[in-house]
Structures are given as C-alpha cells and as structure tokens.
C-alpha cells in the first residue's frame, strides 16, 4: 500500500509551497488508494506556536485534503526516540562525543585556513579513555567512512554521495533532545512511509537519513524532491509575491479548488490541460511526472482559475460563501438574477461581494471622472425623460428584458445612441462606469429604487 505524509513544523503558518508539497503527497496516496498521514514536527519547544498548529489544521480542512488516522505529534514521541538512541549506543553504531563548542570552533577555523571542507573529525568515534569532566556529551551516529550513499530520486534521478561527505552527525544534543534528521527517519519508517515527497531543500538531508535507516535496519522509502516555486522573475518567492499563509488566500476571496488547481500545475502537467477538478487530479497525478525545474508563480493565472471556478459555482453555494465577505443575499428575492449578473465580473469573492454591494447599495457619491464623462450635454434631459417613461410604462417591469425595452424606446424616440442613455444611467445607478448591465441592475433593484437613484443623480447635474 502507498503511504505518504506531510510533516509541517508549527513554528509558522502553512505557506503555498508547503501546501503544494502536501497536495502532491495527498494526490499520490489517493491515486493509489493508499494513506496520507499528517505529522506535526513540534520538537522545537521554544519556537512552537499553538496558533500556527491550529492554522495548519484549518488550512487542510479548508482545502478539503483529509488525512488518514490521527495526527502524529513528534513532541509526544521522545521516549520512542530515546529507545532508538540507546539501541544504537548499545550496538556500537553511535557514541558519545565530548567535544566542546570551543574545540569544534577551533577545528572549523583550522579546516577553513587549510581550505578544507568543515566537518567533525571523528575524534571520539573510537574513544575508550576517561571522559573529560564537566562536559555533557552529544550522541553521534557512526556514518560509513568509505563507499557511496546512493538512492534514486523520483524527480532528480540517481543520486550518489561519497560516504566521506557525510560526517558522524549528531543524533541527540547534550540535553538529550533528538535532532531533526534522526527523528524524521524514525518516524517515516515507523509510520510505514513508502513515498516521501518534499521540497528539494531537503535533498541533502536524505543521505543522513539513509544512514539512520541503515543503522536501524529500516526499509528506505522512495524519495521525490520537488523544485521550489519562484516568483514571476524566476527568483525566490517572497511574501510580497504570494508566499503567504494559505488562509490569507481564503481571506482574499480565493476558492480552495482554484488554489489546488493552480498549485498542481506548478511543477506538474498532463498534456495541455489547465483546468483540473480534484477528481481529475487524483485520477491523473503521478509523482514521476513532477518537473525537475522550478516553477514560476503567476498571480494572473491564479485569478483566471479563480474566476472560472466562481463562474461555475451554483448560486446557492456562492450565496453561502459570500456571507463571510459581508454580503448576505440568501433570502433576497432576486438572488439568482443578482448572481447571474455579477459572478462573471468577480475574479475573487471579495470582488464579487463588492459588485453586489455596488448594486444593492445606492451610491452616496459619484466617481469624479465618470461624472465628467457621463453627466454632460443632454444627460440631464435624457435621464429626466427616462424617469417619466418608467413612471408611465404600462407593461410589467420585472425582468432585464423589460427594462431593456424601455431603454430601446428612449433611444428610438430621442434618436440617440445607446451610450447617451447608458453612461449617465450607469453612473446614476452605481456611482461609477463599471459594474453589471443596466437592464440587470434595474431589474434587481426594482422600478421605485431605480427612479429614486436617477432622481438623486439628476439633482446633482448643473
């Protein structure tokens, strides 16, 4: 059975790079009817944040990426790690190192002066003498001193690292707490991981973890190291570019399905297809198809995808989602008409909410540039005649087509172009030159509100 995992540290919020890695892992598990596990790597007690941990869990809930089984917390597994440290000590595969910080710094300076690679020199590897007084030892694992540490990375290909490139690294600090590469290898092995998908910033942790796997007799999983996400200029993605908390995307009005669709295409493709439902992602995703090169973040692409998913949402779903953005139209008698008129105009739920507010709230002032363009020449006379026509119209005025007929009549009677009524009418009803179609707006707000808004606008025209 395929078993994958995502293992964030609750020292900060979940960013989109992490979410993409989690998505690739989740899709791999779901594609193979396997398990996707979630592990919280909370061993850094000084930097851990309960708020960050909760935000990570909320982000997973928001995007709908469910995990299997209970969340594993490393902070609750210290006794387990100690058991394996003791085992390695007893088997002679690890040892106590009494080297002080001062000695280690002196060694590094000496190596740097000789232009050698800085590394621990193994001086306590076979030490049998009397330990120095007053020094709390660290525990180091015995790394192989010759040969090659090899593995095949599913993205990068064959990786061969000379054994002497990996020194006897620390697996337990002087206070007894275990180190990152040690606990990650143990957890991945005990959780039954078959495939480890992670950012390629972890690529050079892998040889150390393989040393731990081999020392403890664990099976080595398949590794996939995914290239980073860059900004549009090909440089490291920053918060300004979009490397922000996943939940910030929710606050900005992005839909989870749009964000997942966007992220799956950052480093993976399936022909020329751009739009993927979650079901299609699960069906088609294979980690072997992950690109070797870094992907560039493109906000316009994300906005395009988000607009697509908004447009294809049912009106009832959109009405529910809009409540979080200060717009409750769930009981509005023109809900369908209102959303049909606006949902193709909003690239985010925030924009959609603003479009709806623009229609439902009478303008208290008018855009200055729009006024100069629209409220000139015959505008006052045309609007006044339009009010009179609405007041004396004998047919029902309910649908956009009904109001369009009134507009057609005034255009015909006054022998003017549609722009002569359209522009001043738009500014009168919405306060600006942008927004939904005028016939739709009038049908939504009704004839009385339409007349009231036009009269208010006419009173401001000199």
From Swiss-Prot:
UniProt keyword Aminoacyl-tRNA synthetase present: yes
Subcellular location: Cytoplasm
GO biological process: glutamyl-tRNA aminoacylation
Gene3D superfamilies to which the protein is assigned, alphabetical: 1.10.10.350, HUPs
Reaction it catalyzes: tRNA(Glu) + L-glutamate + ATP = L-glutamyl-tRNA(Glu) + AMP + diphosphate
Entry superkingdom: Bacteria
Keywords per UniProt: Aminoacyl-tRNA synthetase, ATP-binding, Cytoplasm, Ligase, Nucleotide-binding, Protein biosynthesis
Any one cellular-component term (Gene Ontology): cytosol
Classification via SUPFAM superfamilies: An anticodon-binding domain of class I aminoacyl-tRNA synthetases, Nucleotidylyl transferase
Residue sites binding ATP per the record: 239
GO MF: ATP binding; glutamate-tRNA ligase activity; tRNA binding; zinc ion binding
EC id: 6.1.1.17
Position of sequence motif 'KMSKS' region: 236-240
UniProt motif ('HIGH' region) ranges: 8-18
Family matches, as HAMAP family: Glu_tRNA_synth_type1 (MF_00022)
Subunit structure: Monomer.
Family from the record: Belongs to the class-I aminoacyl-tRNA synthetase family. Glutamate--tRNA ligase type 1 subfamily.
PANTHER family xrefs: GLUTAMATE--TRNA LIGASE, GLUTAMATE--TRNA LIGASE, MITOCHONDRIAL-RELATED
Record's function text: Catalyzes the attachment of glutamate to tRNA(Glu) in a two-step reaction: glutamate is first activated by ATP to form Glu-AMP and then transferred to the acceptor end of tRNA(Glu).
Entry protein name: Glutamate--tRNA ligase 1
Biological source species: Sulfurovum sp. (strain NBC37-1)
């Amino acid at each position: 059975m395929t078993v994958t995992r995502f293992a964030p540290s609750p020292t900060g919020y979940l960013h989109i790079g992490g979410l993409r890695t989690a998505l690739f892992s989740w899709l791999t598990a779901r594609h193979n009817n396997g398990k996707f596990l979630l592990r919280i790597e909370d061993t850094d007690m000084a930097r851990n944040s309960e708020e960050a941990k909760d935000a990570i869990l909320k982000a997973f809930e928001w995007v709908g990426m469910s995990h299997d089984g209970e969340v594993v917390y490393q902070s609750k597994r210290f006794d387990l790690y100690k058991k394996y440290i003791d085992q390695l000590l007893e088997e002679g595969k690890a040892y106590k190192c009494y080297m002080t910080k001062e000695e280690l710094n002196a060694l590094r300076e000496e190596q740097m002066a000789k232009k050698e690679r800085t590394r621990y020199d193994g001086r306590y590897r076979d030490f049998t003498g009397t330990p120095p007084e007053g020094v709390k030892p660290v525990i180091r694992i015995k790394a192989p001193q010759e040969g090659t540490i090899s593995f095949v990375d599913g993205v990068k290909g064959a990786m061969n690292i000379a054994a002497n490139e990996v020194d006897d690294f620390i697996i337990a600090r002087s206070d007894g707490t275990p180190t990152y590469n040690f606990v990650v290898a143990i957890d991945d092995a005990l959780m039954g991981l078959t495939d480890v998908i992670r950012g390629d910033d972890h690529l050079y942790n892998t040889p150390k973890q393989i040393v731990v796997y081999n020392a403890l007799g664990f099976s080595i999983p398949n590794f996939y190291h995914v290239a980073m996400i860059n900004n549009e200029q090909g440089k490291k993605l920053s918060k300004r570019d979009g490397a922000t908390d996943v939940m910030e995307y929710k606050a900005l009005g992005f839909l989870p399905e749009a964000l997942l669709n966007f992220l799956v295409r950052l480093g993976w493709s399936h022909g020329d297809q751009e739009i993927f439902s979650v079901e299609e992602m699960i069906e088609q995703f294979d980690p072997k198809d992950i690109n070797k090169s870094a992907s560039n973040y493109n906000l316009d692409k994300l906005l395009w995808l988000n607009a697509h998913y908004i447009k294809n949402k049912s009106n009832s779903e959109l009405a529910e989602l809009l409540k979080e953005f200060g717009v409750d139209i769930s009981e509005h008698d023109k809900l369908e008409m209102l959303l049909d008129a606006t949902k193709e105009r909003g690239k985010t739920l925030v924009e959609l909410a603003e479009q709806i507010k623009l229609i439902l709230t009478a303008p208290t002032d008018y855009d200055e540039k729009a006024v100069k363009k629209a409220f000139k020449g015959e505008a006052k006379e045309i609007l006044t005649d339009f009010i009179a026509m609405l007041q004396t119209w004998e047919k029902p005025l309910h649908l956009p087509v009904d109001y369009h007929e009134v507009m057609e009549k005034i255009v015909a009677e006054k022998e003017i172009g549609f722009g002569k009524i359209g522009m001043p009418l738009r500014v009168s009803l919405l306060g600006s030159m942008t927004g939904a179609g005028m016939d739709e707006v009038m049908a939504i707000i009704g004839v009385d509100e339409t007349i009231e808004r036009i009269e208010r606008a006419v009173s401001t025209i000199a």
